[in-house]
Regions:
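Membrane-interface helix-loop junctions in multi-pass transporters/channels
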Residues: 1-115
């Protein structure tokens, strides 16, 4: 446990730095969000498949730390709320469905990699 906390913190910092770096490509906030969440789901699929022990320190560092720092569910909520507030219900629904669909496909694809 003593080694896990610093590893998760370092992983979280790396993930957050990755999210910031992806944001520097100049894409829209919606595209950035879709990219980071899809990458995070793919990586998490690999991590969970490769390290099935739930409390494995590397799984925690990569899954909770890196993937947790990279992805953002709250960012998705903000993007959807902005669209709903603007009256763009169809766009909000499409974005939500696309995010969930791509996330699931990416996770399943990542989970298949170690096999």
């Amino acid at each position: 446990m003593d080694r896990v906390v610093p590893a998760v913190l370092a992983g979280g910092a790396a993930g957050a730095a990755g999210r910031w770096a992806i944001g520097e490509f100049g894409w829209s906030s919606a595209t950035n969000l879709l990219v980071v969440n899809t990458i995070g789901c793919f990586v998490l699929g690999i991590v969970i498949a490769a390290l099935p022990e739930r409390e494995h320190p590397i799984r925690l560092a990569l899954g909770v730390g890196v993937c947790g720092g990279l992805t953002t569910f709250s960012g998705l909520a903000v993007e959807l709320a902005v669209r709903l507030d603007a009256g763009d219900v169809g766009e909000a629904v499409a974005m939500g469905m696309l995010s969930l669909g791509l996330g699931l496909v990416a996770f399943l694809g990542g989970r298949a990699v170690p096999a």
